[in-house]
Amino acid sequence: MNSYLFRIGSKTSGFLRSTQFVRSYSKHVKSESYKKALEDVETQVAESPCILYMKGIPERPECGFSNTAVRILQAEGAVFTSYNVLKNNDMREAVKEFGDWPTIPQLYVKGQFIGGADILMGLYKSGELSKLLNEAGVVKKDE
């Protein structure tokens, strides 16, 4: 998957590359429920203009990184759907595989993987996130 991170030319650390190797080396036989979860992620990403896979719900995030991602999106006025990956372990693992990204939260806008909390924070601080969300048409308009 061609993520926003890689489109803007960011490089991954050696640690991330080694983590990806271990994950690909240790992949287990996929259960039917896992395959279904992977299909569900693909469908959700395709059908949702802006979706955040997170731990918890926006009103009650269950980890600091998910909280950060939610607060950033709210500060930008983004209209987004969320999915609590803690409800389903197959879904949590499917999200990680789909985005080829080892951590949660994960944000997708118009089918494109944007990143996790740290990347969102960097994009937010630089103003790039505002531009990206506005261009995607996922920001609430003042009436």
Swiss-Prot record:
Glutathione binds at K55, R92, E93, A94, V95, K96, I104, A117, D118. One of its GO terms (cellular component) is mitochondrial matrix. Residues 38-140 form the Glutaredoxin domain. It is found in: Mitochondrion. Its main location: mitochondrion. Residues 1-25 form a transit peptide. It holds the Pfam family Glutaredoxin. Keywords: 2Fe-2S, Iron, Iron-sulfur, Metal-binding, Mitochondrion, Redox-active center, Transit peptide. [2Fe-2S] cluster binds at C63. InterPro entries: Glutaredoxin, GRX_PICOT-like, Monothiol_GRX-rel, Thioredoxin-like_sf. GO terms for molecular function: 2 iron, 2 sulfur cluster binding; metal ion binding. Belongs to the glutaredoxin family. Monothiol subfamily. Homodimer. Monothiol glutaredoxin involved in mitochondrial iron-sulfur (Fe/S) cluster transfer. Receives iron-sulfur clusters from scaffold protein ISCU and mediates their transfer to apoproteins, to the 4Fe/FS cluster biosynthesis machinery, or export from mitochondrion. This is Monothiol glutaredoxin-5, mitochondrial. It comes from Dictyostelium discoideum.
